[in-house]
């Protein structure tokens, strides 16, 4: 797999306080990586480093030449007094044709939202629009900062299924940031546990049993994860992430989220 971004012994200090300590991280094409950690662990700072928005105190970051990064922020702040449709919001991302805007929305199952008021969207609808905006760049790397914030549980499952589908469709790398792993883990290739330094990293199965992860999140999180993996009813999804009628099935004894589909 081609390496898109490599962080080598990254350190970031704020007023003599070390926020990131000797971070080593590699993001490769086609992989979904989930960065987890409690509030204040340095996750947002690490995202800024990857996006090139945060200077380093020491260390080195290597980016593939010409890499395109699509970013979905944790929060979207809009001026409530200014009317803004989804279509107009997407046009703010650059010079794209009407067809390109419609295609981006179609890919995320949001084509029907094109004329909707941005201020009146639900949490899940907002995330789909933000994802569509990121896809307009045809990114090599998609960075999502707490993408499920403000989205209900079923909406989270649908959102992560959609991200997984888009990864398979475009072959891009995905970096997801979260403080809660009980849903995202089923769709992740690699997990990185952060508490200013990398506490542990590896496959979802190994991290769920790792002492550092259990110390950070507790056994209850692992139990919730196991329930999601083995007992939920899931649907096959089309490219937009919407369920295909008549193809629902129940998972009883296997985890289906860890295989890469080429």
Swiss-Prot record:
Keyword NADP in annotation: no
Subcellular location(s) per record: Cell inner membrane
Record key words, sorted: ATP-binding, Cell inner membrane, Cell membrane, Ion transport, Membrane, Nucleotide-binding, Translocase, Transport, Zinc, Zinc transport
Organism: Vibrio cholerae serotype O1 (strain ATCC 39315 / El Tor Inaba N16961)
Coiled-coil parts of chain: none
Major location (coarse): membrane
Domain ABC transporter: 5-220
SUPFAM superfamilies with a match to the protein in the record: P-loop containing nucleoside triphosphate hydrolases
Gene behind the chain: znuC
GO BP term, example: response to zinc ion
Membrane-protein topology: Peripheral membrane protein
Name of the protein in its database record: Zinc import ATP-binding protein ZnuC
SMART domains: AAA (SM00382)
Protein role: Part of the ABC transporter complex ZnuABC involved in zinc import. Responsible for energy coupling to the transport system.
Gene Ontology terms for molecular function: ABC-type zinc transporter activity; ATP binding; ATP hydrolysis activity; ATPase-coupled transmembrane transporter activity
């Amino acid at each position: 797999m081609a390496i898109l971004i490599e962080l080598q012994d990254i350190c970031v200090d704020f007023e003599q306080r070390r926020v990131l300590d000797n971070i080593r991280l590699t993001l490769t094409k086609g992989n979904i990586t989930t960065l987890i950690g409690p509030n204040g662990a340095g996750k947002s700072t690490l995202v800024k480093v990857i996006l090139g928005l945060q200077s380093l105190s020491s260390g080195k970051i290597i980016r593939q030449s010409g890499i395109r990064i699509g970013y979905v922020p944790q929060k979207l702040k809009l001026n409530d007094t200014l009317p803004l449709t989804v279509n107009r919001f997407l046009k703010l991302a650059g010079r794209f044709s009407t067809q390109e805007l419609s295609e981006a929305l179609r890919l995320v199952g949001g084509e029907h939202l094109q004329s909707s008021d941005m201020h009146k969207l639900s949490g899940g609808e907002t995330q789909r629009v933000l994802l569509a905006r990121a896809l307009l760049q045809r990114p090599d790397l998609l960075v999502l900062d707490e993408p499920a914030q403000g989205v209900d549980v079923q909406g989270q499952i649908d959102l992560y299924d959609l991200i997984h589908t888009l990864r398979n469709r475009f072959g891009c790398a995905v970096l997801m940031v979260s403080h809660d792993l009980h849903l995202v883990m089923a769709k992740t290739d690699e997990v990185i546990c952060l508490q200013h330094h990398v506490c542990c990293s590896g496959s979802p199965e190994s991290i769920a049993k790792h002492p550092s992860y259990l110390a950070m999140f507790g056994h209850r999180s692992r139990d919730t994860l196991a329930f999601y993996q083995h007992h939920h009813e899931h649907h096959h999804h089309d490219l937009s992430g919407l369920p295909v009628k008549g193809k629902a099935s129940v998972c009883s004894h296997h985890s289906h989220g860890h295989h890469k589909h080429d």
